[in-house]
Amino acid sequence: MGVVLATVGCAVGLGSVWRFPYMLGANGGAAFLLVYILFMIFLGIPVMVTEFFIGRYSRSNTVGSFKKMAPGTKWCWIGYNGILAAFLILSYYSVVSGWTLEYVWQTLSGRLYGQPDIDYTADFQDFASNVFRPIFWMGAFIGLTHFVIVSGVEKGIERASKIMMPLLFLILLIMCVRSVTLPNAEAGLLFLFKPDFSKLTSSVVLSALGQAFFSLSLGMGCLITYSSYFGKDTNMQATAWQVTIINTLVAVLAGIMIFPAVFSFGITPSAGAELVFITLPNVFGQLPLSGLWSCIFYILLAMAALTSTISLHEVATAYVLEEFHMTRKKAALIVSLGVFFLGIFSSLSFGVMKGFTVGGLAFFDALDYLTAKIMLPLGGMLTCIFVGTRVDKKVLKAELTNEGTLKFRLFGAYVFFMKYVAPIAIGIVFLNELGILKWITGK
C-alpha cells in the first residue's frame, strides 16, 4: 500500500490542486473536465502502465532503465531527457512551493488578514519580487524535501505518502464542504459539472490532453523511477487505474473547493495561475474565521507541493546514486544544492532579474516552457515508440501479467495503441504546444 500511495503522491501534486482548477476555469469548465477524464482513461493509463513496465523490469533509474533494455543504443537519451526535465521543473516548482510556506506563515502570524483594506495583488507582487524572502522559503522547502529523500524510499517517501495523502483528502473534503455551503455556490457547481459543448473548441481539447499528460507526471521519469521499487507481485494494471482515479478525484475535489467560492464572491473563473495567491486570499478574507480557512488551504497546497517535489527530487537522486555509486545522502545533497542554485534565478526573475529574458520569456517562464511544452511531450512520445517497436512482446506480456498470473485480454490492442495511437496523440499535443499546429492549419 505504501508504494501505491507514494506513486499516487508522485502524480498528485501542484498539477492537480493548483494547475488543474485554473486550466479548467480558463477552458470553459465542465466540457474541459469531461474531455480531460476521457484522456486520462484512454491515454494516461496505457502510457502509465508502459512507464511502470520499464521501471519494474529494469530495476533501475530512468537512464539505467533504457541502458539495460537497449544497450549500446541512443534510447538512453529518453532517460537523460526525463532526468533533466525533472531537475529543471523541481528548480522552479520549489519557488512556488516556497510561496505556499510564506502564505501559511502569513496566515498563522495574522499578517494576511490583520491589516485593513489590504491589496492582495500588491502584497503578492511585493513578496514575489523581494530578493531574500522567496529564496528563504524556497530553501526551507528544498530542505524539507531533502530530509524526506535522505530518509530513503521506505522510511522517507512511503512513510510521508502514507501520512500526507490521507491528510490531503481530509483537508480537501473539509474545504469542499465549506465551499458548497456559500451563497450562490450552485453556480460554481454548474460551471464545474454541466457541460456547455459550444465551448468545446480544438484548443480546449488539446489543453485537456496536455493537462492529463501533466497531471500524471508522464514523460519526466518519475513513474519509471518509482516503479523500479515495485514488488514482483505488484499489479501494475490495477495500480495505474488506482493512481488515475485518485488523481482525477483530487482534481475534481480541488474544483469543488475553488469554483463555488469563486462564483459566490463574483470572481472570474478564468483568473489564471494567480487564483491561489491573489484571488483566494480575497475570498478567505470575506469569510468568518478567515484565518482558519486560509491556513487549512495553504497547508493543503504545501502538502500537494511536497508530494511533487519529493517525486521530482527522487528522479535525479536515484540517477546520481546508481550511476555514480554514491551514498543516498551525498547524491541527495548534490541534487538539493543544484536545485537551490538554479531556483535562485527563477525566484529573482520576479524581481531584480525581471528584465533578463530567454527567448523573450522571464527565466521562470522559460524553464516552464522548455519542460512542459518540449521535454515532457517529447519524452513521452519517444517512450511509447520505444516500447511499441523495440521491446519483445513476450517479455512485455509476461511482465504486465506477472508471469501469467494476471489477465490482460486487451494486450494486442494495448500494443497497437502504444505503437501508433499514443505517439500520434502526444505528437499532436507537442506540435500544438509549440504553435506548429496552428501554423500548419492557419487557425
Where are these regions (language model features)?
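Membrane-embedded translocation segments of transport machinery
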Residues: M1, E158, K162-L306, F324, ...
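Select transmembrane alpha-helical segments in multipass membrane proteins
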Residues: M1-T7, F32-V35, K74-F87, F136-F141, ...
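Loop-to-transmembrane helix boundary motifs in multi-pass membrane proteins
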Residues: M1-V4, C10, I135-F136, I246-V252, ...
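Membrane-interface "cap" regions at the ends of multi-pass membrane proteins
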Residues: M1-W18, I45-F52, R56-M69, T73-Y80, ...
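Transmembrane helix-boundary motif of multi-pass solute transporters/channels
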Residues: G2-F39, I224-S227, A238-W241, I245-I246, ...
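Inter-helical loop and helix-membrane interface segments of multi-pass membrane transporters/permeases
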Residues: Y22-N27, Y57-N81, S94-E154, P183-S207, ...
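Helix-loop-helix connectors at the membrane interface of multi-pass transporters/channels
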Residues: G64, S97-A128, Y229-D233, A238, ...
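C-terminal membrane-solvent junction of multi-pass transporters and transport-like membrane proteins
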Residues: P71, I78-N81, H325-S336, D368-I426
